[in-house]
Amino acid sequence: MRLLYVIKKENPMDQMPNCPKCQSEYVYHDSINFVCPDCGNEWDNNEIQESDDDQLIVKDSNGNLLAEGDNVLLIKDLKLKGSSEVLKKGTKFKNIRLVNGDHNVDCGKIMLKSEFLKKA
């Protein structure tokens, strides 16, 4: 039988984080995960810290911040490498994903640089 303790934070020096879902201060540590008894959320504190540090900042050609799921437009004609096709200016890409690398926007079947895109 395992005993789980609920610890109420008394001072800011405690190591127990608030629940990221409901911000409850009543959390407990269960082997490798933290658990919130109020909302039932379970999380690994290392994952949350890594996701905060790894925020990807991508700007379009006009300096606007791009986010996951945005719609973007091409600002100039681009030749596809290894093909005779050309992507025309004004082509709209929906629901983009941001990734690390020199081609930092994933538009589904192709990857593009954010400098050739503007937010729609």
Curated annotation (Swiss-Prot):
Alphabetized InterPro entries for the sequence: YjdM, YjdM_C, YjdM_N
Range of residues in the leader sequence: none
Gene Ontology terms: cellular component: cytosol
Superkingdom of the source species: Bacteria
Pfam families assigned to the protein according to its UniProt record, in alphabetical order: YjdM (PF03831), Zn_Ribbon_YjdM (PF08274)
Similarity comment text for this entry: Belongs to the YjdM family.
Listed NCBIfam families: phnA
Protein name as annotated: Protein YjdM homolog
Name of the gene encoding the protein in the UniProt record: yjdM
